[in-house]
Amino acid sequence: MSDDPEDRMLGWDESVFRDEHVFEIDWLPETFKHRDTQMETLKYALRPAVRGSRPLNVIARGPPGTGKTTAVQILFDELTAQTDVKTVRVNCQMDSTRYAVFSRLFAEIFDYEPPSSGISFKKLFSQITDKLVEEDEVLVVALDDVNYLFYESEASDTLYSLLRAHEAHSGAKIGVICVSSDLELDTIDALDTRVQSVFRPEEVYFNPYGQAEIADILGERADRGFNEGVVGPTVLDRVAELTEEQGGDLRVGIDLLRRAGMNAEMRASRSVETEDVEAAYDKSKYVHLSRRLRELSDSETALVEVIAAHDGQQAGDIYDAFSEQTDLGYTRYSEIINKLDQLDIIDADYTNVEGRGRSRELTLNYDADAVLERL
């Protein structure tokens, strides 16, 4: 290669990326590293379904970005390809009510959406179970981000309907995998006793990845996604270090690699340097926040904006400002506060206020400008 700097620069029609899709969150790796124990437990729980029986129920818990959803997707792909077991993954951030969950199940089972109105839950439920019995299929449902059902007080009713399906319709066989990233949520204790008695799940914990594991996993992505020689070991180690600082959330590291590659291209460079990683980090470290903010309703987003403008004030004072923008009552306002607190977007700690007793003080857990930029 020529020593001329111009020859080492990217041309307009060139890229550092070999396959940029590798850096999408939904890309499934060919090898799922450092999760053998978790995968074996999941396979153990689902094995009865392959024999035509109801599988064991499962709770998969762990911090964000530790492979829970990937594990479910890989197992579901294997079951679908090799067996007659029906699998459905429900994103509970999007489908956060019992009716929405069963509408998703209906759509996946029948390959078309249920009527948008005029169909009761009872009829929706019976059509799903009728189909399962008619086809003699076992259904495994993954409630991904199940914590969102708890935030909306829908978890117990949803799980009760799924777990008692065989009583409502003889022959219906349904197993449930609950996937939760909220480590402060005790899933079992938060359920009604009527659900606790029938749930009895296997528990699988996805621990945070260590720095060496992060480097190993991201190294595979880098090899697949970048052209040869674009990312060196020093850069990869720095990405792994920054990812571990964010709790080992692989989504941070994956996004960081992609943005660092884009920064290298902006410099017309054929290689990613540490400076590209550092410049990308300010955005990549908020990937988890961005994901949570995208799923908020209009009223929830409006409250986040108000809290950003009145950060650290009392809940009553913030409600006065919030009520000027919406017609929601204080009860719904309190419910939204609880949800934002559970999502770790805000802290809502009780404090003693002179002359007013105990009141909640609402503070953002992130820089206000960073939050507002992502709304």
Swiss-Prot record:
Record key words, sorted: ATP-binding, DNA replication, Nucleotide-binding
Residue positions binding ATP: 66-70, 209, 221
Organism domain of life: Archaea
A Pfam cross-reference name: Cdc6_lid
Keyword ATP-binding: yes
GO molecular function ontology, one term from the record: ATP hydrolysis activity
GO biological process: DNA replication
Family designation: Belongs to the CDC6/cdc18 family.
Known role: Involved in regulation of DNA replication.
Name recorded for this polypeptide: ORC1-type DNA replication protein 3
Native source species: Haloarcula marismortui (strain ATCC 43049 / DSM 3752 / JCM 8966 / VKM B-1809) (Halobacterium marismortui)
Gene that encodes the chain: cdc6c
